[in-house]
Regions:
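Extracellular mucin-like PTS domains
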Residues: 13-29
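Conserved SGNH/GDSL esterase-like catalytic core that processes O-acyl groups on lipids
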Residues: 31-40, 44-138
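Stable alpha-helical elements in mature extracytoplasmic
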Residues: 44, 48, 52, 96, ...
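Anion (oxyanion) recognition and catalysis
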Residues: 57, 156, 205
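Short, well-ordered beta-to-alpha junction loops that form the rim of enzyme active sites
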Residues: 116-118, 166-169, 215
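The substrate-binding groove and active-site-proximal loops of carbohydrate-active enzymes
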Residues: 133-142, 184-188
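A short helix->loop->beta-strand "cap" motif at the edges of active sites that frequently abuts
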Residues: 157-161
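Substrate-gating cap/lid alpha-helix
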Residues: 172-215
Length: 215
């Protein structure tokens, strides 16, 4: 299959921002504006963002900008073999930070929500190396911790609170109709999500503008 098609799907450019209803009487106060939430991550984040968009429309309490991109992990560069397909870091992912900076400038989020992790717990070749590595190995752990800190600082640069969710346990099911290699899948190996979550919490210890929410 054309591996570039794995990242062909991304979120809409349109934010879901409920309108504020004016007070109906002289004694009523104007309700606070919706909290602006920008969702960042891969297909997992894309799905979470779609759910938040529905809730935004129903509740009027939040505005949502869904920037999830299928196939884009949080860590930059190198190669990975998620869903058992070896591939370079996709072109769409290489443009991610530039796109996010532009979207932050327009949307002005109060909260940036990052969720996902599958592409970061699978096996990876880091830039400039020829060896597969993964969470639990010191070199990769140091790389991932630095990437968490980088994204937290970058996405919090406009004053937003940066909220990360922990990674769930991933157990991909093979579907020959989709762009997947056959199992077994490296990201499904025991302990990987748990190690990811340990690194995430450690990375954010000195970042007062950040939070970790357990899924």
């Amino acid at each position: 299959p054309d591996l570039n098609q794995i990242v062909a799907l991304s979120a809409s450019d349109d934010a879901v921002i409920p309108t504020t209803v004016a007070p109906s009487g002289p004694d009523e106060t104007l309700p606070p504006p919706p909290v602006r939430v920008m969702v960042v991550g891969d297909s997992f984040a894309l799905s979470v963002g779609l759910g938040l968009e529905h809730w935004a429309n129903e509740s009027g309490q939040i505005g949502v900008l869904n920037t999830g991109i299928v196939g884009c992990g949080f860590g930059r560069g190198g190669m990975n073999r998620g869903i058992n397909l070896e591939r370079e870091w996709p072109d769409a992912c290489k443009e991610r930070d530039q796109i996010l900076a532009q979207k932050m400038g327009v949307f002005q989020p109060d909260i940036v929500l990052l969720t996902g992790g599958m592409w970061d717990i699978t096996d990876r070749k880091l830039d400039g190396t020829d060896t597969w590595t993964h969470v639990g190995e010191p070199v990769y752990d140091a790389y991932l911790e630095a990437e968490f800190r980088y994204l937290t600082d970058f996405l919090g640069s406009t004053g937003a609170t940066v909220v990360w969710t922990t990674a769930p346990t991933f157990s991909p099911e093979y579907n020959p109709q989709t762009f997947m290699g056959k199992p077994p899948y490296y990201e499904a190996r025991p302990g990987r999500s748990e190690r990811y979550n340990e690194i995430l919490r450690r990375a954010l210890e000195a970042r007062p503008n950040s939070r970790v929410v357990a899924l």
